[in-house]
Amino acid sequence: MAKDDVIEIEGKVTDTLPNAMFKVELENGAVILAHVSGKIRKNYIKILPGDRVTVELSPYDLTKGRITYRFK
């Protein structure tokens, strides 16, 4: 999948799940399941419920995403 195909949207982490998975409520009100990207995992960036994050969504499955940035 090319990098141009992803949809980037902001959201808020609502719940923490096992295996570095999170429930994220997007700006449009949808709740998706998201995992942590490799760069965030590599740099030991902690993500907690209530954090604002940027999520990448695939156009093929809009219910799952990847957290690529945590706002300060």
UniProtKB/Swiss-Prot annotation:
It holds the Pfam family eIF-1a. Keywords: Cytoplasm, Initiation factor, Protein biosynthesis, RNA-binding, rRNA-binding. Its main location: cytoplasm. GO terms for cellular component: cytosol. GO terms for molecular function: ribosome binding; rRNA binding; translation initiation factor activity. It comes from the Bacteria. Residues 1-72 form the S1-like domain. InterPro entries: NA-bd_OB-fold, RNA-binding_domain_S1_IF1, S1_domain, TIF_IF1. SMART domains: S1. It is found in: Cytoplasm. The keyword Kinase does not apply. The keyword Zinc-finger does not apply. HAMAP family: IF_1. Component of the 30S ribosomal translation pre-initiation complex which assembles on the 30S ribosome in the order IF-2 and IF-3, IF-1 and N-formylmethionyl-tRNA(fMet); mRNA recruitment can occur at any time during PIC assembly. One of the essential components for the initiation of protein synthesis. Stabilizes the binding of IF-2 and IF-3 on the 30S subunit to which N-formylmethionyl-tRNA(fMet) subsequently binds. Helps modulate mRNA selection, yielding the 30S pre-initiation complex (PIC). Upon addition of the 50S ribosomal subunit IF-1, IF-2 and IF-3 are released leaving the mature 70S translation initiation complex. PANTHER family: TRANSLATION INITIATION FACTOR IF-1, CHLOROPLASTIC. Belongs to the IF-1 family. This is Translation initiation factor IF-1.
